[in-house]
A protein has these predicted regions:
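Intrinsically disordered, low-complexity non-transmembrane regions of multi-pass membrane transporters
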Residues: 1-19, 23, 74-88, 203-213, ...
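Alpha-helical transmembrane segments and their helix-start/interface "positive-inside/aromatic belt" motifs
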Residues: 14-22, 46-52, 80-88, 148-153, ...
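Helix-loop-helix junctions within the multi-pass membrane cores of secondary transporters/permeases
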Residues: 78-79, 87-158, 336-417
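Juxtamembrane and boundary regions of transmembrane helices in multi-pass small-molecule transporters
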Residues: 2, 138-153, 168-169, 201-247, ...
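Transmembrane helix-loop junctions in multi-pass membrane proteins
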Residues: 32-46, 66-74, 100-115, 134-146, ...
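Interfacial loop-to-helix junctions that mark the boundaries of transmembrane helices
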Residues: 13-19, 40-50, 82, 115-124, ...
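Hydrophobic core segments of alpha-helical transmembrane domains in multi-pass membrane transport
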Residues: 24-37, 51-61, 93-100, 130-141, ...
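Transmembrane helical segments that form the transport core of multi-pass membrane transport proteins
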Residues: 243-356
Length: 515
């Protein structure tokens, strides 16, 4: 165990630099705003800075922990259930995995509290069942080789059909649920499952089908919550603003974070427990991994646990009040339109601080053998989130229905999926679920809510929906990146024979024969 810990120290330094590169731009933007056009109280600013420090350390531990534990666990489990070749076993275990992982996702508790007219347990069990069911569909797609775009047309068609019958006060929360439930706990494990299942197939389409699980799992919660909205007629969703901190000294500042730590220690322990138990069962029944591999996974799980506790504490206690207050101040200006470009700027950088984005970018680079670099993926995601936050702020200022953005957006995204390489489509729809993580829920959503309060809008219909918007735009930007790559490849293939012909044309006949 000591050897594993020592070996991980250089990696921790590398991850610390990555975390600083992700969080420092956001902190710098907020500081510039605070010292210029959006003054905030010292209490809020100090909480934000301490929260940023905790997020940096949290990302450092989580990203290394996910590499060491969640990814190998998911890949091994995915491979072993596929090796059984028994469809009922594969589908049954797939449903159970999806259900158990989702039911313990911390962000799902937050979603349940936003919809008071539906009993919390009913909502949580329904959403978990939705994820489990669509993980089964995802496994079937991979094993049978069903086209992802065709399934997306079918299921998103069902979603928008149901949306016509859901109360408008409930619509945005329902679409937010798809992004909320694919959080930092579920994404690394589910993505690794996909790689493990596709690796057993070993055919030429295996890499294309290794992505798409998160995309399918994001559909289940939306359908489940829309159906519940029709059944319960949930039109009385309420908004409880975050309490703005007031501290007079450093001890009170630490107390704010210290009081919340036990909550997140318990939440993350409960979240990790089902994954650990399921992996333990597989280890005793089928995996039989050696001690060193198990030790590495144990250290990785410890890093993951510490990282997520620090990250969520920093985000919820430090970032959420700052986001809400900044939104109020910016939208309260005489030039309230400033919230749109400021939101876009923050959105561009904030996605880089999403824990699961690191896992996605690294896995994309590995599966594509570097054809899609982590940097290119990061740029495509940042551009997508920037656009989505800008559109979300337009909604806050104008009160336009979210469907005016989601319907054309998804129609375009699914439409181009039929001409874009399959791998890019699967990655793009996975990226939507990954980008809309806890940083969106704890900073961008409060930013929109604060702005909505300042302009006197309807919080439930106008501010909620930011998560859904953030989940939608990467579907377009990542696929457009794939389309550009495809066109460049075709152009290079056309130019290659012409270039060779031109080179030979300039040589004498004797030289050509010698060649």
């Amino acid at each position: 165990m000591d050897a594993i810990l020592k070996a991980s120290l250089p990696k921790l330094r590398e991850k610390l630099l990555e975390a600083l590169q992700a969080v420092l731009p956001i902190a710098a933007i907020v500081l510039v705003l605070c010292f210029t056009i959006a003054p905030v109280s010292p209490s809020i600013l100090l909480c934000f800075l301490l929260g940023a420090a905790m997020i940096v350390v949290g990302i450092m531990f989580f990203t290394l922990g996910a590499e060491m534990s969640m990814t190998p666990m998911g890949e091994r489990v995915g491979a072993v259930i596929t090796k059984s070749r028994k469809l009922p076993v594969i589908l049954g275990i797939g449903f159970l995995l999806g259900f158990l992982i989702t039911i313990s996702e911390p962000d799902l508790q937050v979603l349940a509290n936003q919809v008071p007219s539906i009993p919390n347990r009913t909502l949580i069990l329904s959403v978990a069942a939705g994820v489990g069911l669509f993980l089964v569909f995802a496994f079937l797609r991979m094993l049978i080789g069903i086209s992802l775009p065709k399934l997306l047309v079918l299921f998103y068609g069902m979603i928008f059909l149901l949306a016509a019958f859901v109360p408008k006060e409930f619509l945005a929360v329902a679409f937010d649920s798809g992004g909320v439930t694919t959080g930092p706990m579920t994404v690394p494990f589910i993505m690794a499952l996909g790689v493990g299942v596709s690796a057993i197939r070993g055919d030429r389409h295996a890499a294309d089908d290794s992505f798409g699980l998160v995309a399918m799992c994001s559909i289940g919660p939306i359908l489940a919550v829309l159906i519940l909205g029709i059944v319960f007629r949930a039109s009385d969703s309420t908004y409880i603003p975050p309490v703005l901190p007031e501290v007079s000294d450093s001890v009170e500042l630490w107390q704010l974070f210290h009081v919340s730590l036990p909550t997140y220690l318990e939440e993350i322990a409960v979240s990790l427990l089902p994954i650990i138990v399921m992996f333990g069962i597989f280890q005793f029944v089928a995996l039989y991994m050696d001690r060193r591999s198990l030790g590495r996974i144990a250290v990785g799980l410890a890093y993951t646990y510490v990282g997520l506790v620090l990250f969520l504490t920093g985000a919820n206690v430090g970032f959420m009040p700052a986001g809400n207050y900044l939104g109020q101040v910016l939208a309260g200006q005489s030039f309230r339109w400033i919230i749109i470009p400021m939101g876009m700027l923050i959105g561009y950088f904030i996605v880089k601080a999403e824990p699961a984005v690191y896992v996605l970018n690294k896995q994309v680079e590995e599966v594509t053998d570097g054809a899609i670099s982590a940097q290119a993926m990061g740029t495509a995601l940042s551009a997508g989130v920037s656009i989505s936050v800008g559109l979300a702020m337009v909604r806050v200022l104008t009160g336009v229905s979210i469907l005016w953005f989601l319907v054309p957006g998804y129609v375009f995204a699914i439409g181009i999926s039929f001409v874009v390489p399959k791998l890019f489509t699967a990655i793009a729809f996975d990226a939507g679920g990954v980008a809309s993580g806890p940083m969106t829920a704890t900073f961008l959503l409060p930013l929109a809510q604060g702005a909505c309060v300042a302009v006197g809008g309807n919080i439930v219909t106008d501010a909620f929906g930011v998560v859904a918007m953030v989940a939608m735009t990467p579907l377009i930007t990542v696929q457009l990146m794939g389309l550009v790559a495809q066109l460049r490849t075709r152009k290079a293939r056309r130019l290659q024979p012409a270039a060779m012909g031109a080179a030979f044309a300039g040589l004498p006949d004797d030289d050509i024969i010698e060649l």
